[in-house]
Amino acid sequence: MSDARNNRKVYRGRVVSDKMDKTITVVVETTKTDARYGKRVKYSKKYKAHDENGEAHTGDIVEIMETRPLSATKRFRLVDIVEKAVII
């Protein structure tokens, strides 16, 4: 049982929205190698993550971890705020 818990996906991304109550939207940018030409192509994906205390704000770099379904679209939870956004 503990092995299944340790195999959860952990992603690092940037918060693009914190307007919802206890929910943040995180963009995870990664690269994929093109099958035909071998060129590395950037792509991004948005995930909704549970933020219990409302700690993360737009622009922060965060780590999110896979968890049980918390709502119709939420499958991740906030683990750590790696870097706070600089507000000018």
Swiss-Prot record:
GO terms for biological process: translation. Gene3D superfamilies: Nucleic acid-binding proteins. Keywords: Ribonucleoprotein, Ribosomal protein, RNA-binding, rRNA-binding. One of its GO terms (molecular function) is structural constituent of ribosome. Belongs to the universal ribosomal protein uS17 family. Part of the 30S ribosomal subunit. One of the primary rRNA binding proteins, it binds specifically to the 5'-end of 16S ribosomal RNA. This is Small ribosomal subunit protein uS17. It comes from Levilactobacillus brevis (strain ATCC 367 / BCRC 12310 / CIP 105137 / JCM 1170 / LMG 11437 / NCIMB 947 / NCTC 947). The lineage of its organism: Bacteria, Bacillati, Bacillota, Bacilli, Lactobacillales. The gene is rpsQ.
